[in-house]
UniProtKB/Swiss-Prot annotation:
Alphabetized GO MF terms: large ribosomal subunit rRNA binding
Keywords: Ribonucleoprotein, Ribosomal protein, RNA-binding, rRNA-binding
Species name: Idiomarina loihiensis (strain ATCC BAA-735 / DSM 15497 / L2-TR)
InterPro entries named among the record's database cross-references: Ribosomal_uL10, Ribosomal_uL10-like_sf, Ribosomal_uL10_bac, Ribosomal_uL10_bac_type
Keyword DNA damage: no
Protein name in UniProt: Large ribosomal subunit protein uL10
Amino acid sequence: MAIGLAGKKAIVKEVNDVASNALAVTVAEYRGIEVADMTALRKKAREQGIFVKVVRNTLAKRAFEGTQFDDMGDALKGPLVYGFSMDAPGASARLFKDFSKENKNLQVTALSIGNGIMGPEKLDAVASLPTRDEALAKLLATFKEPVSKFVKTVNEVPSKFVRTLAAIKDAK
């Protein structure tokens, strides 16, 4: 099915708009995946707020121009599906990693967080990045720990004094 020039321009604009607002992109080869499996991947992506699209590589290269993913051009070879993380940098990598466990035909070929392209060996590292809420929770726990230790230390001095007085009273 041939796409006309207007359709190609619309695809490039749509992908460019998404790429401009995305935190990260994960690119995977989907050769050999059945339609039902690809539909399941898209459904999971929608539930997680990840934009997934199959685009011709030449159109994707043009769509990435002027975005933070401009350097992805050399990695775009073969039938590829693109996953754009809009909320958490590791979301699309996590989705593709989990899906590739069930379906071995999905092979991550490249990923990018901002400027810089990474190979598939970095998939585990990117997929393990915390979400915004998880990162904030860890940060708050880090801030809270020294304060709680200080309060316990300050509280320990009077209670130790009271225990000493009680021991002296019991001794007499």
